[in-house]
Design a protein with these regions (language model features):
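Short N-terminal edge-element motif at the start of the domain
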Residues: 1, 124-184
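Structured domain cores in non-transmembrane regions
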Residues: 2-46, 165-246
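Short amphipathic beta-strand/extended segments with alternating polar/hydrophobic composition
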Residues: 155-160, 201-204, 330-333
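Extended, well-ordered protein cores
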Residues: 45, 63, 68-141, 150-153, ...
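Non-Sec secretion/translocation targeting segments of pathogen effectors
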Residues: 94, 298, 332-342
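Residues in well-ordered beta-strands of folded domains
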Residues: 117, 145-147, 158, 192, ...
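Phosphate/anion-contacting hairpin/loop surfaces
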Residues: 1-3, 28, 34-79, 230-283
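Repeat-associated, polar segments at repeat-unit boundaries in modular proteins
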Residues: 115-118, 122, 216, 221-225, ...
Length: 342
């Protein structure tokens, strides 16, 4: 195993399947995952490769406090983001003392100019079954591999970034990626690879002229993925259905469609039409409060009428059609039908 993280496994016995899985996992780690893994290994000090795999599959048990490279910086970070003092108390709190006290109460390590800590006192790593069939890629909606003049091997960055204390515009994944590339801005970087959790989105690199625009859209895509319509039922199915309806294979258009799902009527595939029709009738104010009439209401016919009214098209993820509301394009340029000339 030639990855620079492999010395952390020195002395551990492993099978070929474990070796191969670890090698692939290391190659697919983002810059942030690499730091989390280094910190977790120092915190847990595993003796076996099985425990190491558990750590890799449980990186969400750990978090990184960006730029907290000593007790002073850690104390400042803690007072800014985690334990915020009153303005009156601030002058009587020494950041170094606060940082040391925070370390004493938790389990963490300073790793390459940052602080990595275990989020729970007793992690549930033992409940994670080491699985060499598990994905070798972290739980990201989209990943971009960047290179720079100072780092031609490149690093992965992934979104959404689940960090709790960070700048939403400049998440840790981006900042750590730039640090690893020894680059100050994305203008000094080039995107060389990309993958997306939505199989419809293809050929991502050729959709963008700059790494900066691609990464900005990837960050927003990650937030959209994480929010999932703030818990709206069948939201992801509707998004994928609308993407299929619009023959969407571009990242920018996918972002626009996610923000305009209210412009589409949708029925999930395999849904109970009777229940769907009843819910739809209540939502549209067709049904009143009379239990007898509601019991006799033909909700299947109402759902079928709704489908016919909007001319819903069949896709792999359900039935959808535009409902007449205007689609607002923020990320992409809408395609216009060619005008006829006399």
């Amino acid at each position: 195993m030639k990855h620079w993280l492999s010395p952390l496994l020195e002395g551990m016995e492993m099978s070929k399947s474990e070796h191969d899985w670890l090698e692939q996992r290391f190659e697919n780690m983002t810059a942030k995952e690499e730091l989390l893994f280094q910190g977790a290994m120092q915190i847990e000090n595993p003796r076996t490769v099985q425990t190491t795999i558990q750590i890799l599959q449980g990186l969400d048990h750990y978090r990184l406090l960006y730029g907290a490279d000593d007790d002073v910086a850690l104390g400042r970070f803690v007072m800014e983001h985690i334990h915020t003092p009153t303005p009156a108390a601030r002058g009587y709190l020494d950041p170094e003392i606060v940082g040391a006290a925070y370390r004493d109460k938790g389990a963490g390590r300073f790793v390459e100019n940052h602080y990595v800590e275990r989020m729970a006192r007793n992690p549930n790593l033992l409940n994670i079954e080491p699985d060499t069939e598990a994905p070798v890629v972290g739980d990201y909606a989209i990943r971009i591999k960047l290179v720079s003049r100072n780092n031609m091997e490149g690093v992965w960055i992934g979104f959404p970034d689940t960090g709790e204390y960070m700048d939403a515009v400049h998440p840790d994944e981006l900042l750590l990626g730039l640090d690893a590339l020894q680059a100050e801005t994305l203008d000094q970087c080039m995107a060389v690879d990309a993958d997306c959790a939505l199989p419809q989105i293809t050929d991502i690199l050729n959709q963008y002229d700059s790494a900066g625009e691609l990464v900005r859209h990837a960050i927003d895509f990650g937030y959209v993925w994480a929010e999932q319509g703030q818990g709206e039922p069948h939201w992801l199915e509707k998004w994928m259905c609308v993407m299929e309806l619009e023959d969407c294979h571009r990242l920018d258009l996918a972002l626009d469609l996610a923000q305009n799902l209210h412009c589409y009527e949708f029925i999930p595939r395999g849904v109970d039409l009777a229940q769907y029709g009843m819910d739809l009738a209540r939502k549209e104010g067709v049904l009143g409060q009379d239990p007898l009439l509601n019991q006799c209401f033909d909700s299947v016919a109402y759902a079928q009428h709704h489908m016919a009214k909007y001319g819903l098209s069949t896709t792999d993820h359900g039935y959808a059609a535009r409902n007449g509301q205007e689609v607002i394009y923020e990320y992409s340029q809408p395609e216009h039908e060619p005008e006829m000339t006399m």
